Amino acid sequence: QLREIAKLVHEAGKELIVAVNALMHQDMMDRIKPFLDFLEEIKTDYITVGDAGVFYVVNRDGYSFKTIYDASTMVTSSRQINFWGQKAGASEAVLAREIPSAELFKMPEILEIPAEVLVYGASVIHHSKRPLLQNYYNFTHIDDEKTRKRDLFLAEPSDPESHYSIFEDNHGTHIFANNDLDLMTKLTELVEHGFTHWKLEGLYTPGQNFVEIAKLFIQARSLIQEGKFSHDQAFLLDEEVRKLHPKNRFLDTGFYDYDPDMVK
């Protein structure tokens, strides 16, 4: 499948980014080189990397693809990003989702490489290598699915309205923010402050709906480049995003408008 995807991407004149951003145990590191060789073979343009061991192998063996530093739940510092750019050769970095705009807009003054910002989709807030769901099932003698398609949620005891998506795979347990992110109405501000690398996360937005949402953000980007992205245009495109978003999931602007003192 990845080989076919690479073919389609390159035929369309686009660049292929492949996620290699797991935190690697030694057994995974022992198997990483054949996978990196395959990515080189299919002419991957970028890989996302969250483990120092992968950076080491990529640089040691001289692979041609570029690297994007992606330990996104932990990346909140410009100096941290610059370190990976300088020492590991990262060409870009993925920012954490928990950075208020007041702090975010200070970062370009220090950043030496581009930073990617999530503008739509589920926001990961915690990752554990442990099989937390399976451990819970074992303790409670429950036999149930752990995958994303099971659509499981966590709720805080003090807040029954909370609903943190959770699933488990062979990389561990993944937990996501209460609501999904939608920064359609904030795109002009992001561009004005130098954030032009955007990510759309389609993990919980299946099929064609995600494709249509991506097209709306592409339309917004084109309007911004032409100087035609008005407040009304942003509102109209935002309404279209909300129509296409899964009905059982809510949207907000995440930490974007938070007071930085509330996050520390």
What are these regions (language model features)?
Residues 1-73, 94, 100-264:
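Active-site pocket-lining/capping segments in soluble small-molecule metabolic enzymes
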Residues 77-79:
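Conserved nucleotide-cofactor-binding alpha/beta core module
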Residues 81-101:
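Internal, well-ordered domain-core segments that constitute the primary functional module
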